[in-house]
């Protein structure tokens, strides 16, 4: 897209920058962190107090609105449904489907507006905030509806005006309020705005309602009855095109010309000369621009003026002619008294069929990417953006969806919606998703499991490992060793699994028992991730065998753990001490050969300890508890060796 031709909006931050220091910043997903640095600006040698605050600036506050969150959630399901149905329909059925999708989006917008209306009436404190949001949503729905008519329905001459009339009736409702006030009064025909109601209905092409109101005037005034009858007849006879009708444009134009001549004849004959209100209505029917402009207060907007002008002057307007009438109607309506608003520029761009300008203008004025992302996606399905690629490889649809989804990832729950938007961005969506998944704050295990499932479904191996490592570290910091071990196994992180296994063994040495037995008992093939984890699993298996009095199997396993040297050096003595109850059993458990192995392991342990200990520390440790345990082991091993030799000798004889 082109460079912006407007200056970006400034956001003043109270208190920031008052100390004449340089400002530091750090970007986050949807946020900007600002703070004052220690560095003073040039030319300022005065010392000033440091600002004790940091400021978090959010680029999109809308995602924190409870009502707008409903908009994001419901439009997400519409978006996903549209993507899934992209290949299912074609031709006329596809067009009807796209029109229905567009109406679904608009119905969600209108539901949000209605809810905000209710909230603004019930809460005074935040009423202004809701009114502002209603104004933005109203502009979105107005613009979307026009784009639906011009780009999706692609209505030809004739049906085009019918759709534009429906558009105006839906979005300009002042005449309904006027008529309600009139009908509530005791004498409606004497109400000061009675004729405003009649004229307002006529300006919107609502001839039946205008005739019903006019009938009240005819019933109360005998002098005006004949004029009312003539005006009613003109309103009744006004030719109107209908969607799906069989009437050709040529036939319609012929009828419309005859009807117009009849209106002009009554005006020239002075049929309504005694009633200025009826005469004004007749002039409106003839499309008198001067009278139409006099009624601008009833229309309130230039686009209502445009549609009314077309209704009475050029009802068979072609789509290619709209931009001329739109620009001239805007100029006539404003009459140089004011400048066009941003919404006016958006609507003008739509009437010029410049969809890129519509997207650009709304991107400038909107506080979020919801409107432009979803509208662009819908129009892309209408194949209106095929040739508009951006320089970095993504088309405009993908660019806007990526930005919208990135904004969703800054919210603690809406980030899950953003995943699907990335999924339907074929060029860069996967890479964006990888980056965002690595930066999600994993505040709870439930959230981590959701993130993990998303990454596993998309075979994002590195992100799976990153999430598991993060959760393993969090669990370790919270002293939840079982959870930490489980996460490290899922991450297939051998080093971290070794670290946690060491923590389990250390805890066992301190307490004399294991925590999280269910996890350790069911490690299965996961224990092969690291030697230390294998040792932990097998060591727990030794304890289980011992508790089940499978002494021979327990002894063999214990000996294999010692000879395999996969236990940490600090744990060797604990292993040897675990052999003591087996050595003291009435039945000989360890054979002579196994006892020699145990003795060798004990001496190796003592030798390793001597190598790593200074002479002064050796003297201090001579009377330590460890020394006593070693002597007990040596004595038990010697006794067991003697018993084993005797037993084995007796068996040989």
UniProtKB/Swiss-Prot annotation:
Keywords noted in UniProt: Membrane, mRNA transport, Nuclear pore complex, Nucleus, Protein transport, Translocation, Transport
Pfam family, one: Nucleopor_Nup85
Keyword flag Protein transport: yes
GO molecular function, one term: structural constituent of nuclear pore
Keyword Ribonucleoprotein in annotation: no
Domain of life: Eukaryota
Coiled coil: none
Swiss-Prot/TrEMBL GO biological process terms: mRNA export from nucleus; nephron development; positive regulation of DNA-templated transcription; protein import into nucleus
Disulfide linkage: none
Gene Ontology cellular-component terms listed: cytosol; nuclear membrane; nuclear pore outer ring
Subcellular location: Nucleus, Nuclear pore complex; Nucleus membrane
Similarity comment: Belongs to the nucleoporin Nup85 family.
The protein's assembly and partners: Component of the nuclear pore complex (NPC).
Function in brief: Component of the nuclear pore complex (NPC) that seems to be required for NPC assembly and maintenance. Involved in nephrogenesis.
Protein name: Nuclear pore complex protein Nup85
Species per Swiss-Prot/TrEMBL record: Xenopus laevis
Organism lineage: Eukaryota, Metazoa, Chordata, Craniata, Vertebrata
Gene: nup85
């Amino acid at each position: 897209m082109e460079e912006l031709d407007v200056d970006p909006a400034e956001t003043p931050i109270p208190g920031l920058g008052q100390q004449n220091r340089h400002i530091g910043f750090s970007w986050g997903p949807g946020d900007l962190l600002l703070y004052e640095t220690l560095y003073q600006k040039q030319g300022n040698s005065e010392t000033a107090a440091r600002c004790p605050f940091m400021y978090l600036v959010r680029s999109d506050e809308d995602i924190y609105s409870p009502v707008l969150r409903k908009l994001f959630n419901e439009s997400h399901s519409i978006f996903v449904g549209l993507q899934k149905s992209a290949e299912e329909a074609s031709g006329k059925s596809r067009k009807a489907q796209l029109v229905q999708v567009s109406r679904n989006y608009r119905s969600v917008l209108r539901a949000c507006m209605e809810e905000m209306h209710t909230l603004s009436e019930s809460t005074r404190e935040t009423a202004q905030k809701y009114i502002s949001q209603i104004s933005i949503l109203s502009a979105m729905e107005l613009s979307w509806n026009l784009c639906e008519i011009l780009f999706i329905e692609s209505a030809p001459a004739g049906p085009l005006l019918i759709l534009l009339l429906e558009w105006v009736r839906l979005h300009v409702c002042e005449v309904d309020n006027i008529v309600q006030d009139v009908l509530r009064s005791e004498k409606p025909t004497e109400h000061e705005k009675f004729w405003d109601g009649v004229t307002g209905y006529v300006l919107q092409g609502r001839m039946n309602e205008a005739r019903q109101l006019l009938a009240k005037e005819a019933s109360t005034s005998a002098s005006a009855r004949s004029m009312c009858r003539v005006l009613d007849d003109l309103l009744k006879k006004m030719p109107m095109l209908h969607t799906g009708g069989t009437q050709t444009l040529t036939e319609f134009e012929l009828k419309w010309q005859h009807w117009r001549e009849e209106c002009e004849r009554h005006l020239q004959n002075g049929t309504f000369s005694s009633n200025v209100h009826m005469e004004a209505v007749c002039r409106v029917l003839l499309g008198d621009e001067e009278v139409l402009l006099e009624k601008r207060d009833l229309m309130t907007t230039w686009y209502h003026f445009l549609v009314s002008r077309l209704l009475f002057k050029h009802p068979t307007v072609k789509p290619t002619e709209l931009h001329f009438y739109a620009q001239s109607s805007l100029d006539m309506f404003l009459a140089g008294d004011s400048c066009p608003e941003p919404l006016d520029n958006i609507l003008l761009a739509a009437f010029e069929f410049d969809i890129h300008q519509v997207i650009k203008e709304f991107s400038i004025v909107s506080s979020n990417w919801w409107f432009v992302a979803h509208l662009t996606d819908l129009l892309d399905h209408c194949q209106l953006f095929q040739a508009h690629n951006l320089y970095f490889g993504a088309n405009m649809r993908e660019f806007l969806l990526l930005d919208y989804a990135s904004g969703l990832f800054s919210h603690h729950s809406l980030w899950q919606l953003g995943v699907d938007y990335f999924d339907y961005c074929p060029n860069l969506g996967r890479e964006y998703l990888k980056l965002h998944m690595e930066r999600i704050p994993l505040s709870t295990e439930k959230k981590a499991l959701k993130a993990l499932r998303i990454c596993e479904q998309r075979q994002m191996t590195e992100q799976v490992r990153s999430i598991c490592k993060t959760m393993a570290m969090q669990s370790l910091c919270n002293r939840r060793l079982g959870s930490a071990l489980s996460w490290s196994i899922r991450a297939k992180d051998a080093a971290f699994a070794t670290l946690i296994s060491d923590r389990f063994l250390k805890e066992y040495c301190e307490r004399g028992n294991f925590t999280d037995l269910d996890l350790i008992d069911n490690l299965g093939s996961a224990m092969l991730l690291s030697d230390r984890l294998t040792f932990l699993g097998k060591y727990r298996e030794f304890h289980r065998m011992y508790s089940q009095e499978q002494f021979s199997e327990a002894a063999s396993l214990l000996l294999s753990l010692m000879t395999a040297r996969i236990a940490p050096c600090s744990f060797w003595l604990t292993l040897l001490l675990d052999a003591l109850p087996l050595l003291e059993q009435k039945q000989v458990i360890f054979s002579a050969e196994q006892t020699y192995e145990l003795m060798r392991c004990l001496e190796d342990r003592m030798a390793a300890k001597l190598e790593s200990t200074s002479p002064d520390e050796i003297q201090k440790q001579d009377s330590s508890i460890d020394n006593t345990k070693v002597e007990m082991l040596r004595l038990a091993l010697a006794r067991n060796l003697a018993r084993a030799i005797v037993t084995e000798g007796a068996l040989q004889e």
